[in-house]
């Protein structure tokens, strides 16, 4: 992820009228959405009209998953009560208006955060007014089977990961004791940081 591009830019891409989101996240989502994902989604929806729609992602994928869920919900492409969003290490995507719009559209939305993962705290809320949508599930531990967690239904709760100051990028690399950073181990010859 081009972290400087992400954290140093105000949310400028318009979403749903008055809401603003980070252009880097929006462009990444929109590139995939308009390159065939939307058509594939609609085809699968028509073949399976009774299914729920589960959308998930980690890091940039979490931001894109949030935008996908909000896009599908706001354009009424799927019943709202059947949209389920679960992300891992999702960064802040947009402004308060986006967070409120997201909250009003998607009732089943959970941002899972591992211990001191730094990336859910980027871009900082005090820069350009970025704000998370709800709800947060915070594991202030190693995320082993049976480990305790705290659920916070507010958008930016001091009872969850906002209460910690010892942020660490290493906690972003594994969730539930599974290594999720593919660039180190997966996709031989693929460089996710290359344009």
Role assignments for model-derived ranges:
Residues 57-61, 65:
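Gly/Ala-rich beta-loop-alpha elbow adjacent to hydrolase catalytic centers
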Residues 1-56, 74-82, 106-107, 194:
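A conserved cap/lid and substrate-binding interface adjacent to the catalytic center
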Residues 55-58, 87:
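Short glycine-centered, acidic/aromatic-flanked micro-motifs in structured strand/loop junctions
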Residues 66-74:
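Short glycine-enriched nucleophile-adjacent loop
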Residues 77-157:
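The feature captures the conserved acid-bearing segment of alpha/beta-hydrolase catalytic domains
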Residues 13-26, 128-195:
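C-terminal His-loop and adjacent cap/lid subdomain of alpha/beta-hydrolase
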Residues 64-67, 123:
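Generic hydrophobic alpha-helical membrane-span motif
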């Amino acid at each position: 992820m081009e972290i400087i591009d992400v954290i140093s830019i105000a949310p400028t891409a318009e979403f749903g009228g008055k809401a603003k989101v980070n252009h880097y996240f929006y462009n990444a989502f929109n590139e995939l959405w308009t390159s065939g994902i939307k058509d594939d989604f609609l085809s699968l929806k028509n073949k399976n009209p009774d299914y729920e729609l589960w959308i998930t992602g980690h890091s940039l994928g979490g931001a894109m998953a949030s935008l996908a869920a909000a896009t599908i919900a706001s354009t009424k492409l799927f019943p709202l009560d059947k949209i389920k969003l679960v992300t891992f290490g999702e960064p802040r995507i947009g402004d308060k208006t986006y967070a409120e719009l997201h909250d009003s559209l998607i009732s089943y939305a959970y941002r899972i955060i591992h211990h001191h993962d730094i990336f859910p705290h980027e871009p900082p809320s005090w820069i350009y007014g970025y704000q998370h949508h709800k709800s947060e599930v915070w594991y202030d531990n190693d995320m082993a089977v049976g480990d305790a967690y705290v659920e916070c239904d507010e958008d930016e709760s001091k009872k969850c990961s906002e209460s910690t100051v010892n942020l660490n990028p290493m906690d972003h690399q594994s969730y539930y004791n599974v290594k999720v950073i593919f660039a180190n181990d997966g996709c031989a010859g693929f460089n996710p940081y290359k344009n």
